[in-house]
Amino acid sequence: MKIATCCLGKKTKKFFVCILISIAIACGFLVFNAARLKSRQIDVQAIVQSDIDQTVALSHLSNAVQIPTVSYTNRVKNDGSVFLEFQELLETSYPSVTAHLKRYTGEDFGDAQNPSLLYEWSADRSEEIPAILLMAHYDVVAIEQTSLEEWQHPPFSGAIENGFLWGRGTLDNKGAVIALMEACERLVKAGFKPRRDIYVSLGHDEEVGGKYGNQQIASWMRSKGIRLDMALDEGGGIYRGVPGLAQPAALVGIAEKGYVNITMRVQLNQTETGHASIPPRETAIGILSSAVTQLQQTPFPTRLDGGVSRMLDYLGPEMSFFNRIAIGNKQIFGSIIENQFSSTPAGNAALRTTLVPTMIESGFAENALPSTAAANLHLRIQPGETVESALRFLRSTIQDDRITLHIDQTLDGKPRDQLGYREPSRISSDTSASFEGLHRTIKQVFPNVAVAPFFVVASTDSAHYDDPTLTKNVYRFTPWNLDQTGVTLIHGVNEKIATTQFIQMIRFYEQLIINLAGNT
């Protein structure tokens, strides 16, 4: 009996030793993978802060904000005089740019009603180097009239108070327009000669899709045989408060989601309708409501292999040790990472194609059962997926022949005035010379940030240049530094920009032009 007990004890001891060895090996594997995460941040010296006449620069932005360049989907509603006034403001505010850069207008693009602008800064060398395109837009979204009393300063005041410049467009996107023009003006005055052609595009209808602005400019560029190494538009930025990261994150968009508006319609026979006092088991509204609920309860699958994975490859090495263990072992902890991201609206949008019902229409009387009901579904589609794959997912989820899906109809069954969808963009390189130039510039001007690529969830005018025959790489980044409160000001009440941030934006564009087009 003692022998048996002794043998059993030895076996138990050996078993636990094996368990401990296995745990040690597993821990070593996790730690090894975490240790393999090497920083991808470029080590550069911060630039010497150049002298900028802040009073003049801020007055230019204030004047720009005071011009209410609101764009509408139906461009007949646009006030052409304010767009012309804005163009004249640029011409008088930046005399060196006006004198030395060639300016193209709507007439050059074949549409005299197009108030978008394109500046060409010709290279000082004869060698063929692909050009770069720097983009911003000067149209803004309308002000909700019921919100006017909530504004601390009138939305088109351009007021400067307590370190902020207030007004619609300060963040989206007149701040970038004026910062870009200030940078060009300073460089022209200093005698800077670019070694490659530089184009500056200032759109007038980005907020409504860019159909008459940058879409026409991009077509004109193709017709002229212009080739772009890089296009840079809005989309990313510098954000504070990224979970697990002690420093701000400078997120550069290397792709953007597509979108589609889908009309989901239920059409019943007249025999299935009638008086509300004798309702059938199912109604058009009930069927539609059930389908909407089913879609919301069955979200598109998450994809960690997309923009989130690339972002973590850059940010992971800058995080704490335990975060590095999770990120360095994504094949093991992928589901945990996905759950953490999808717990917030922004993180959820980064991980998957999203769907949200935005409009619903049915009924014609309080006591009558309608034969039809329709809802608009707005989808933002992940790069790597398509509009067609999204439609297949919806059909497989609903599985109801009484429900039809249309991308070419509005809720009332009429044809859409404009294209109801845009496919996701290509994924641009995060190892190209142009991305490296962006990365380097960000670190020179904002030395305490961690740079990372990501996928933009919104749509930008850069989509019109997302054509490999025209543009090699498309990036999306605006050099503002925002926390979550600042992000909510975009298109919101009390939109404003810190005056110090605006001055840093000028320095960023100036240094970017030097890095990408300076003589080396």
Predicted feature residues:
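Metal-dependent amide/peptide-bond hydrolase catalytic core
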Residues: K13-L20, I25-Q54, S59, G237-P248, ...
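Loop/turn elements at helix/coil->beta-strand transitions in domains of secreted/extracellular proteins
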Residues: A99, E128-A131, P194-I198, I226-D229, ...
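Acidic/His- and Gly-rich active-site-bordering loop/insert found
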Residues: I25-R168, K189-R195, L377
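Acidic/histidine-rich catalytic neighborhood of metal-dependent amide-processing enzymes
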Residues: F164-V252
